């Protein structure tokens, strides 16, 4: 009897031939490995989903409010308000141009719900139309708090607040979080009491109304009224104010451009060159006078230290050329000695110098 051992390899004759669909050829493996090397390291799968928190209507309202403030500050800087009109403070100063995106002031919500007649559109068979359940990404509590904080800041700005302390924002965020937690608890309580609604993925109006009344004592229609009268009406009012301020600024800018063009047309280049020539002549004369005055002051200071010689007579003599005929009478000595008179440190004879200029 033949003994079979556990883990023994079968002989070559025992197994059949491998078909091409049972193995991968070596050449194909090499091509696949080269392709993987070219791709680089495999990227890890993104398990976190980024949810953009954006309310187009509130965001547009805040952006339009900022643009209106910028235009009003420019108008106050370059113009002076007199009654109901604005006048330029300096006609020669060009007002800067502003370029705001036109979509910032676009009307996102029309006055009519349907602008065109309703026509029949055949449905497309999709998971959404069939009502198949969808796997929604799980949002952590930290992301929810951050989202509520951003929403609270936007609603405060929409309400008219420009500055708010950190503690006030935190207090309002905590109050909103507690309200939503209680509201969802009331809503889930109604679903738990109805067996047929436990697996429902669609929001029902009756549970929402009961949960809202349990928390606030008012109907759920107050949310619609708030959106209509506070959010939507504020958006339209801010857009209307921005358009009015923009027209006023455009009027001032056109007035500034026309004033600059008028000043340019009235400007005469020949007169400007004459002004430059006159200013250059006056400056050269003043420079020459200052240089002559400095020279005379230096000369006057040196003669005043000589003792008995009068500074005015010496200057007049220098200017008239009298000093050239009398230079032969002046003698100099080196060191501390002198010839025929009291010597000074420079070696010049004061007696001869004195006799030359006195008459």
From Swiss-Prot:
Subcellular location: Nucleus
InterPro entries referenced in this protein's UniProt entry, alphabetically: Histone-fold (IPR009072), SUPT7L (IPR039460)
Function: Component of the transcription regulatory complex SAGA, a multiprotein complex that activates transcription by remodeling chromatin and mediating histone acetylation and deubiquitination. The SAGA complex predominantly acetylates histone H3.
Protein name: SAGA complex subunit Spt7
A GO CC term assigned to this protein in UniProt: nucleus
Gene Ontology molecular-function annotations: protein heterodimerization activity; transcription coactivator activity
Keyword terms of this UniProt record: Nucleus, Transcription, Transcription regulation
């Amino acid at each position: 009897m033949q003994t079979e051992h556990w883990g023994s390899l079968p002989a070559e004759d025992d197994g059949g031939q491998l078909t091409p669909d049972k193995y991968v050829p070596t050449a194909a493996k090499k091509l696949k490995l080269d392709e993987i090397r070219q791709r680089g390291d495999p990227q890890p799968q993104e398990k976190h989903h980024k949810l953009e928190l954006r309310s187009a209507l509130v965001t547009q309202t805040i952006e339009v409010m900022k643009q209106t403030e910028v235009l009003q500050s420019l108008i106050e800087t370059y113009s002076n308000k007199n009654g109901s009109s604005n006048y330029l403070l300096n006609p020669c100063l060009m007002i800067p141009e502003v370029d705001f995106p036109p979509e910032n002031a676009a009307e996102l919500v029309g006055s009519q719900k349907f602008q065109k007649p309703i026509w029949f559109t055949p449905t497309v068979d999709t998971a959404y139309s069939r009502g198949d359940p969808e796997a929604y990404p799980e949002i952590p509590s930290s992301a929810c708090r951050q989202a509520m904080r951003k929403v609270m800041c936007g609603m405060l700005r929409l309400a008219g607040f420009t500055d708010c302390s950190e503690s006030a924002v935190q207090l309002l965020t905590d109050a909103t979080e507690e309200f939503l937690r209680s509201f969802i608890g009331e809503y889930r309580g109604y679903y738990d009491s109805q067996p047929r609604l436990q697996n429902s993925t669609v929001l029902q109006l009756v549970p929402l109304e009961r949960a809202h009344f349990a928390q606030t004592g008012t109907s759920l229609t107050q949310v619609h009224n708030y959106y209509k009268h506070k959010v939507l009406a504020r958006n339209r009012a801010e857009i209307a104010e921005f358009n009015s301020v923009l027209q006023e600024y455009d009027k001032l800018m056109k007035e500034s451009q026309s004033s600059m063009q008028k000043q340019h047309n009235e400007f005469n280049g020949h007169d400007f060159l004459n002004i430059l020539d006159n200013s250059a002549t006056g400056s050269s004369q003043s420079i020459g006078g200052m240089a002559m005055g400095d020279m005379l002051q230096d000369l006057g200071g040196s003669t005043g230290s000589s003792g008995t010689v009068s500074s005015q007579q010496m200057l007049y003599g220098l200017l008239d050329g009298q000093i050239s005929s009398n230079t032969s009478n002046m003698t100099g000595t080196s060191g501390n000695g002198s010839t025929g008179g009291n010597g000074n440190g420079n070696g010049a004879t004061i007696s001869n110098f004195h006799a030359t200029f006195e008459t």
